[in-house]
Swiss-Prot record:
Function: Probable GPI-anchored cell wall protein that may be involved in cell wall organization, hyphal growth, as well as in virulence.
Region (Disordered): 83-134
Gene Ontology annotations for the cellular component aspect, listed alphabetically: extracellular region; side of membrane
Hydrolase keyword on record: no
UniProt name for this protein: Probable cell wall protein PGA61
Positions annotated as glycosylated: 25, 188
Length: 223
């Protein structure tokens, strides 16, 4: 059908131009020349439909042999010969482009989220490390707090201690006073009994009594 319409429209123009150059205007001549250059066969509708509007279809509209009253526009003539263009291909491609763009954007956002969380974790861990005191500082503080009180208490204890009390302890036990022994008098028979009684009263032991008696016996023998 397209080929028949093309022959019915284009071929008469070609014959008219060849038969009588003055029967058609210059636009018809331009259309015929472009047709012969681009589509030598003359009946190839696909070849003519690929031609641009400015090179072929608009001059064809101005051709008085084809469109004497200019009732048809270039697009209408092109639709009659080439058919209506399919508009479904363009929206489909744009939809695919939009969906692919959205998918790339989603992937980029998904990739950026772990990076931001990792940086925040790194910052929080750095902050925690900076705020934690070092082991040396803790050891220094604990050593100072332990040694200082012990040193001060030791010095105070030494300063308040009476060295004489530690070195020379006093014996608090009362020492019994020993009454002096009465020296026996010579030529007195009661001297031995008196010495014995005096010795027992003064808390003297048996050895003291025996010693006094022996001494008295020696004195008596000497007399």
């Amino acid at each position: 059908m397209k080929s028949g319409l093309l022959l019915a429209v284009i071929l008469p123009v070609a014959f008219a131009v060849k038969k009588d150059q003055q029967s058609c205007n210059s636009s018809c001549v331009k259309v015929l020349q472009k047709q012969q250059e681009s589509c030598p066969s003359g009946s190839d509708a696909d070849c003519l439909c690929k031609l641009s509007d400015s090179d072929y279809w608009e001059p064809l509209t101005d051709c008085d042999c084809i469109n004497p009253d200019k009732k048809l526009s270039a697009s209408e003539i092109k639709v009659q010969i080439c058919g209506a263009p399919s508009s479904s291909s363009t929206p489909t491609s744009s939809t695919e482009t939009t969906s692919s763009t959205e998918a790339e954007t989603t992937e980029a956002e998904t990739t950026e989220q772990p990076s931001s969380s990792t940086s925040s974790n790194t910052e929080s861990s750095k902050t925690t490390i900076l705020e934690t005191p070092s082991i040396q500082e803790l050891n220094a503080e604990s050593t100072t707090s332990v040694i200082t009180p012990l040193t001060e208490s030791a010095v105070a204890a030494v300063a308040n201690t009476d060295t004489s009390t530690l070195i020379e302890p006093q014996n608090t036990e009362a020492t019994p006073e020993v009454a002096p022994l009465i020296q026996p008098q010579l030529n007195n028979g009661s001297d031995l009994a008196q010495v014995s009684v005096q010795a027992f009263e003064n808390g003297a032991g048996r050895a003291a009594v025996i010693g006094s008696g022996s001494l008295l016996a020696l004195l008596l023998n000497f007399i």
